[in-house]
Amino acid sequence: MGMFTKLTKSYTDGNLIIQILIGITIGGILGFIAHKSSVEAAIVVNAASMLGNLFVGALKAVAPILVFILVASSIIIKEFGQANGLKNIIILYLVGTFLASLSAVVVSFIFPTTLVLQNTSNALASAPQSIIVVLKDLVFKMVDNPVHAISSGNYIGILTWAIGTGIALRHSSIETKKIFKDISEGITRIVKFIIKLAPFGIFGLVATSVAEAGFEAIGGYAKLLLVLVGTMLFVAFVVNAAIVYFVTKQNPYPLIMTCIKESAVTAFFTRSSAANIPVNMSLCKKLNLDEKLYSISIPLGATINMAGAAVTIAVLSLSAVNTLNIQVGFLDALLLSIIAAIGACGASGVAGGSLMLIPLACSLFGISNDIAMQVVAVGFIIGVVQDSIETALNSSTDVLFTAIASQKS
């Protein structure tokens, strides 16, 4: 028992990124051997696939209640304050997140990516044919019974009820707010536990994918990662630069490079916007910004300024759409941009938060929850790099927008 406890503690205290890399490596090797018609390896892969299915099943079970609680509690608990210029910062956060999502959609159309998914035959039956059908389905999903929405994984209904509950309880008693905060923290702990098991699940998923499709599957992940990282860099150096220039009419790059050097680099390694708040506060002080403003805007940005998350949600959702050969028009893509931006605002405070909101975007196109959760699992496979870049973009943009809003106000 002592040895088991020691091994468990060693695993839980270990570096998740390294553990996931080990899982990917072992799964890839095992899958490759099985792909070359090794009977023994194929038997092991079949057993390993159970780990992948269990991981996806756990994600599928926790995701609906997670989305509801995170979005509702973020509206109920967050105190926005009255600091001068805060309204401008909130507008910048929302506009920046939407433009990031729109950029991701455009890049995905130019460089379409596909994934290796299982059991996709049933997913095509419910694919919508036009924006009218999408909007009709959207409206009916919004008025779904909240209990049914959570139990069936209707993420549009969940989001609608979460926002409604948040607004309705915005001015509730301190005790009520504390209950929602405690529930939110409890759900977050459950998700963290599931994420800790990711190396085993990813081992099973990679082994199964490579055994079925060879290293073609891993090549698909590499292209997907290239599109994700490329889009995030485009947002950081082009979209954000355009926003800064539009607001200040000054060369944006000195400020952008300062934010990347002193905020993004730290966030890249911590992979947490919340953990990077002290770093951002220190940078704001160094830039001589208004303390009353940044003391509110930086923690707020760690919650709602999620450009990187919006990119992840949009790119991975469109990868699923491409894989299933669903035709997407301009208005469909615009609606996806809006939904991805709204969903991204609720992605903070939990490991892999942006990935857990992918089913919300996928549901716009009638993609089943089973398929959407396979896409989430793919996100965890590439998450070693994706999550780091995403957090770096999210966190550094908090300081960037606070700085330009301070100049404006």
Swiss-Prot record:
Membrane topology: Multi-pass membrane protein
Catalysis: reaction(s): L-serine(in) + Na(+)(in) = L-serine(out) + Na(+)(out); L-threonine(in) + Na(+)(in) = L-threonine(out) + Na(+)(out)
GO cellular component: plasma membrane
Membrane-crossing residue ranges in chain numbering: 14-34, 57-77, 89-109, 149-169, 190-210, 224-244, 296-316, 338-358, 365-385
InterPro entries hit by this protein: Na-dicarboxylate_symporter, Na:dicarbo_symporter_sf, Ser_Thr_transp_SstT
Pfam families for the chain: SDF
Alphabetic keyword roster: Amino-acid transport, Cell inner membrane, Cell membrane, Membrane, Symport, Transmembrane, Transmembrane helix, Transport
Localisation: Cell inner membrane
Molecular function as annotated in GO: neutral L-amino acid:sodium symporter activity
The keyword Membrane belongs to this UniProt entry's keyword annotation: yes
A GO biological-process term: serine transport
Protein's job: Involved in the import of serine and threonine into the cell, with the concomitant import of sodium (symport system).
Family recorded in the similarity comment: Belongs to the dicarboxylate/amino acid:cation symporter (DAACS) (TC 2.A.23) family.
Listed name of the protein: Serine/threonine transporter SstT
Designated gene of the protein: sstT
